[in-house]
Amino acid sequence: MLTIPEKENRGSKEQEVAIMIDALADKGKKALEALSKKSQEEIDHIVHQMSLAAVDQHMVLAKLAHEETGRGIYEDKAIKNLYASEYIWNSIKDNKTVGIIGEDKEKGLTYVAEPIGVICGVTPTTNPTSTTIFKAMIAIKTGNPIIFAFHPSAQESSKRAAEVVLEAAMKAGAPKDIIQWIEVPSIEATKQLMNHKGIALVLATGGSGMVKSAYSTGKPALGVGPGNVPSYIEKTAHIKRAVNDIIGSKTFDNGMICASEQVVVIDKEIYKDVTNEFKAHQAYFVKKDELQRLENAIMNEQKTGIKPDIVGKSAVEIAELAGIPVPENTKLIIAEISGVGSDYPLSREKLSPVLALVKAQSTKQAFQICEDTLHFGGLGHTAVIHTEDETLQKDFGLRMKACRVLVNTPSAVGGIGDMYNELIPSLTLGCGSYGRNSISHNVSATDLLNIKKIAKRRNNTQIFKVPAQIYFEENAIMSLTTMDKIEKVMIVCDPGMVEFGYTKTVENVLRQRTEQPQIKIFSEVEPNPSTNTVYKGLEMMVDFQPDTIIALGGGSAMDAAKAMWMFFEHPETSFFGAKQKFLDIGKRTYKIGMPENATFICIPTTSGTGSEVTPFAVITDSETNVKYPLADFALTPDVAIIDPQFVMSVPKSVTADTGMDVLTHAMESYVSVMASDYTRGLSLQAIKLTFEYLKSSVEKGDKVSREKMHNASTLAGMAFANAFLGIAHSIAHKIGGEYGIPHGRANAILLPHIIRYNAKDPQKHALFPKYEFFRADTDYADIAKFLGLKGNTTEALVESLAKAVYELGQSVGIEMNLKSQGVSEEELNESIDRMAELAFEDQCTTANPKEALISEIKDIIQTSYDYKQ
């Protein structure tokens, strides 16, 4: 007689199984394609007929399951089948699962549903027919064929449930093979099905070992963890209702629902009343000398889990196995234990009408016992509290590591959802990361879809924000006499404002008010104001508590005053947070609180920074000596007073430097990725005024030229306040501080090279929704045309503009390279790499019309070192 070696025989069986699984998967793939051609209406009709057929056969299927498994209660299984068909259908019937399922026109989003693919459905012996109905319905509702691996001990009843819904589906127009199953169940067959390349997702319900296998397939899996449900009856609970809920829940189908109560914790104050109520309803309390017998009867030898044969048996059957005499009408066995954990085996999940009871000496102890119960094999599943104290209900929910925290509810039927609460109805309950699951909610049809999003391009909403009031013309300072609520004024300025009598001018105007305000002056602002100066001024501000802050001076005074205002209004503000870079000012990671108390007024005494109308302030960190541009709409002044009388005596060199700063503001804001119809006109007018009046403003210092440049400064400020700047400012911020070059002069030196750089086709394109294509070259050409410069091509116009900027700088006395500013070649070589990196990090870089690489920034700095035109 020929004997086949065991190993070879095993290999042959595995091959047979593989052939079978391949055939099922191939049919499933064809069914998937056929289902994809069905409309939403056709799918809904098919699933509705499946649910009706399951309702019609719910008693027959329950009887089959009860007879085949020998577990649970026939009548309860019938209810579960009815729930799986009726409640599930009611929950999913209106779900859109085919094609376009939603549209948000405002956001430009269209949602498209597509099936996951062929699903492997694994079902348990505890709820065989109801789980089959449930999984088949949610699979077909979402256009997914399903192949079942039934539990061997419930193969025939599960198979019949699948046949019932499949026959109904096909009569309703469904293609064949949308529901299939393994005919000869085995661990090997289930394993091969779960791991088959044709399976898109594993939908697993069963023991922890099987669920773990599902998650180890390397493909999406929806599996659930085991339950070990604590139920806390707190002293304010409605005792009769709580006991009724627990008895009904724990005895339902002989405790086989994984969400059923396992350990009941009772406050000592009501312990006797609760136990008496249990006894009044045929619950048997195990005597001390019977406890060990009960443990031995239902727990395995290692006391690490329940014996499989015990699952779903009646209380009387279990008592008989344990040798414990109980009345014939006993419906529940209760074991009083004093703790939870391995020393108390009955505190584990029991899946039978056996309940552990623990007396709690306090709410704190009760919470701890419930928490320990979850950690003892039930993490993530379900926890219950019976109490009338709403605060305690929330505290319990916050404390327990359970994805379903039920209040005043029978756990078994509460956890599955929709009967006692608004949880999604389901027979597969996710336990989240606590239970090593991928989901934390009740599984339903929406979990079996790929949702595609068609996202239309949209521009970010932009805002044009400037001070609420801008006063201009000579003697605009007189507006201070009529403004509301000026009672305590703090003037922030540099020492020169006091020395040259400007603060006195402001004081004299303020004293013309009907009620003269109190006035304090902080006059210690230095060029490039530091955090130390800001904090010093803040100290005076906090002590004085002004209702009005007046920043008088150039950019340094206004920037320092803005920072003081920021900290004064919101002391919790962090300079570290405020200095951080952002891509979108409306989405910035760190928000500066909007001011609520003091009115902030800016009176510029130079024509350059535009700070009087911008949400920006440049502050130097005293610890690192690095300049940081702060940017937030909270820093926008309330009032700007543009009075040319304050700039008539500004020295020529300062007028030249600040004038070139105006030009840089205007040009960078014009080509910025955030430039808009609201800003470009301001930019162009500022450019025009600068080219027309800067030279005479420097050389002659006449009233008309100075006033025009003062206006140009504010126009450019309004433009860049809303369109932002670019890498000229990014670099100038860094090299100005490093080499001691005035900010406007640094911009003047850099601007011609920035124009040429930005006008070349980018190596890295800028990314901003409104900036639809690279246009910096034509933008610069448009500026050149506006100024009447010569050029027959875009390139020629760009070059004319760069040369015109260089010549304007020279004409006002600026040496247009870094070397002429006293920067040695040694200094440059030592710092250039660091400067380039810091410039890239600068806030202004993000709005540049093309993304600048650090190497390119370095080249710009190098070129500007000894450049001559």
Predicted regions and their residues:
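ATP/NTP phosphate-donor binding region
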Residues: 461-548, 818-819
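Rossmann-like NAD(P) dinucleotide-binding subdomain of oxidoreductase/dehydrogenase enzymes
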Residues: 100-241
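Conserved C-terminal structural/oligomerization subdomain of aldehyde/semialdehyde dehydrogenase
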Residues: 10, 324-460
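Gly/Pro-rich interdomain helix-loop hinge
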Residues: 738, 744-830
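ALDH superfamily catalytic-core signature
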Residues: 8, 17, 133, 211-334, ...
